[in-house]
From Swiss-Prot:
Source species taxonomy: Viruses, Monodnaviria, Shotokuvirae, Cossaviricota, Papovaviricetes
Domain of life: Viruses
GO molecular function annotation: ATP binding; ATP hydrolysis activity; DNA binding; DNA helicase activity
Organism per entry: Bos taurus papillomavirus 4
Compartment(s): Host nucleus
Name under which the protein is recorded: Replication protein E1
Name of the coding gene: E1
Amino acid sequence: MDPKGTTVLDFIEEQAECSQSDSEQGSEENCSDISDLIDNAEYEQGNSAELFAQQQAFDFHKDICTTKRNLKRSLRNAFQCITSQSNTPASRSAPKRRLLDDSGYNEDISTEVVQVDENGGSEGYGSLTSQHLSGVCLNQGDNGGVDKENVDCTALLRAGSRRAAYLGVFKEKFTISFTALTRIFKNDKTCCRNWVGTVYRAREELLEASKTILQKCCDFILLLTHTCKYGFLALFLLEFKTAKSRETVQRLFEHILQVEKEDMLLEPPKLKSLPAATFWWKIQHSNNSFKWGTLPDWIARQTMISHQIADDEPFSLSVMVQWAYDHNYTEESTIAYHYAKLASEDSNAAAFLKCNNQVKHVKECAQMTRYYKTAEMTEMSMGQWIKKCIGEIEGVGDWKQICKFLKFQNVNFLSFMSALKDLLHRVPKRNCMVICGPPNTGKSMFVMSFMKALQGKVLSFVNSKSHFWLQPLRGAKVAVLDDATRATWTYFDTYLRNGLDGTPVSLDMKHRAPLQICFPPLVITTNVNVMQDPAYFYLHSRIVCFEFPNTFPLDEAGNPLLLIDELSWKSFFERLWTQLDLTDAEEDEDGEPRSPFRCCPRSVATSL
């Protein structure tokens, strides 16, 4: 202030100046009805760190309880997982242990592990399982008791220790481990024909009875008995008639031997292990063993010298061709399928399956078989061919059905026999027989049964646009063309007059030069009466025609009253063999003049 003093006006101006915040604060204080809304009192600093620690401990305890509940539900699965780790190689067990360690459960109970007595189980197989189970399963409760979870773990631990003890006894008695003779099936429902079973605590009289009872369902039984600290120890090698699962075999042993499933060790044998096969072959000659049935192939193949020599035998194509020829197989798919099925019986078929070029062998086998069959058929006379064909037809027929049918169609039987004789002997100008008539008169049934009996070939005019549609005539003794239309007869009248005569013609072959052949006996069915059509005048002298005017007779159910099939033609040729003049001059009265065809060298046994 001015030392000289302050005037009244200056004082009023100075006191009248105020800030906006002061006015707003005053208005708010005037408008509020709540007293002491804001506590501006000072407080002392409390123990906030202890409160935070309590909250963290509560959350941690809650998470631990949740984890324990989840582990309690899947306790048995955890035990199976740990057991599988102990049975698998070390390279696979490490990742599974990491999965269990990641759960956090192991760290939580690390201070509550109960030490398992090392003398309670055997070394090797059972020790790892016991250590895992002691760390995971044996957890004491807060009140000092053992809950249901721990009771289950103890039972599982005892079962694992029992299995380990049984494995130790097995190795002590047989000087070889059980796992060296068997392979592991993890699933009890996996089926197999061969099973290895070790049974403990069985009664002697039941073991003797099992030798007879098991013969009903087995092809091979090998039983070896020993005595051990658990009583009788029985080792079974069984080959069942049908594949069975572990559960089925367990129930079978429980029923026959009256033992618990915990007292059994069941696994399939190692089929490709030479030491295992040698073990089984050796114990079958021991004094306290029982054997019934034929030795399984997987043992004989690895232990017997003859089987080993057969396994080393190389593949021979000629043997395969001889097999296909004897069974009349000419198609690639049929040869490949049926020859592969012989691999378990024939050494050459087994060698065929080992080849990397099976397709090449199958094609060559089929081609060679067709070559041999065609050459054999060409060399045969018509009488020899008919005898061969009807000899392959099994059964007895009635030749009179053919005679009745010809009589029903008003066909002279002697005229038909004369025409059939000329047809089979391929007389010129009489090399083609035509059966004409309206539909549903039995033409196709009559001709097709004749073709099947003589193993003839079928021509289809639908392929006439191809140059090779007549190629089946190259390998046929008899040919049939069913339901020829006017277009077919026009084609014959234009291009195939010489073929109907029976004289040589040039036949176009696929992938080959044109071949000169004579048409085989040809039988044609048609609805066109060629003999009465002047448009085909030049064919009249080249065909022999029979007309079937009557509809084929049927009964009320629609079944034919006259049945003509391959058996009817077989009986027909046997009955009228002499009338058809089918006997060859060089054929002896003793029977077959030809020796069987062989395309591979005879074996020693066959030659002797």
